[in-house]
């Protein structure tokens, strides 16, 4: 089996090891094979030396959180995220390597009504204690409220799949904050639900491309696109690479994380009260991929005293579906984050990504979305 990776990108790594301290799986295991350098060595063996795609190789790749914390640390600019996505694409092409229940779950994400129905069943099952706590799910709402209303055409508010099913309150908060800075918003039309981020993580590239094309078609024009999920925002900003078209490139240039969009307009916010101290947790795809973690601090500083963690943005272990697929490693990685949160002191943690929020909340952390906190102060 050949991985079909870019030879130049794969050959860029000089094995310096500067990535190792930034890799969550290496930090908790100390295993070279579970580091970016070790995984690239395994990719090279398959790509250049026709090594067998063994069970060990699959394990090395599937245990990667895809946090991409190694990329900013790499002096050679190795595009590790793209290499891992390409490798996962090859592995996913062999259906024997992807369990049926995983494929079913990813298909549900692309069909919004099925996701909403499934979420309601999960919420009901939680009340009856039929859903195992080890799944790490937050307490899901039995009633999610009305969809986010459109107020005008200044910007698009991307609603997504999981966020719309589980966190409509955050969409309403985001719309409230946008209105407070004199920006009206509207939600995507048909097809603008799932962005395909989890599909890319799983290597289901064809499915991700199909979803991306639908999302692009759901938000025409040149209005900015505001996204309040870090994982979704990173995916939308990467559509140019995913689809390789000028239309996708132009679309990606319109995408902003919610805090990234609001920060330059912060002086317009009519703050009515200040909140207590808030600790900031940086979602990996906001910090390492979008490089948009600083605006979160700008926005939160307008309503609260911001407290920093001392772990330099190390991954929390959520990784999209990672905490469900690799619960043991995800739990070990989370323990390091919990220790850092404990040292920070304040009881409220702000996270701009649902996966991170749910993963931390499952361990008892009080997590709020930055937009929810800002809206509360208005």
Name what the model sees in each region.
Residues 11, 30-34, 199-206:
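Alpha-helix capping and helix-loop boundary segments enriched in small/acidic/polar residues
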Residues 1-5, 34-55, 282, 290-300, ...:
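Short, charged low-complexity linear segments at domain edges
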Residues 21-22, 30, 166-167:
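Short N-terminal binding/cap micro-motifs at the start of the first secondary-structure element
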Residues 18-21, 32-36, 185-186:
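N-terminal glycine-rich anion-binding loops that anchor highly charged ligand groups
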Residues 7-26, 54, 58-78, 313:
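Cysteine-centered iron-sulfur cluster-binding motifs in ferredoxin-type domains/subunits
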Residues 1-10, 50-61, 180-185, 301-306:
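Short, intrinsically disordered, charge-biased short linear motifs at domain edges
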Residues 80-378:
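Iron-sulfur cluster-binding electron-transfer modules in prokaryotic oxidoreductases
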Residues 2, 26-59, 77-103, 366-374:
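Non-heme iron-sulfur electron-transfer modules
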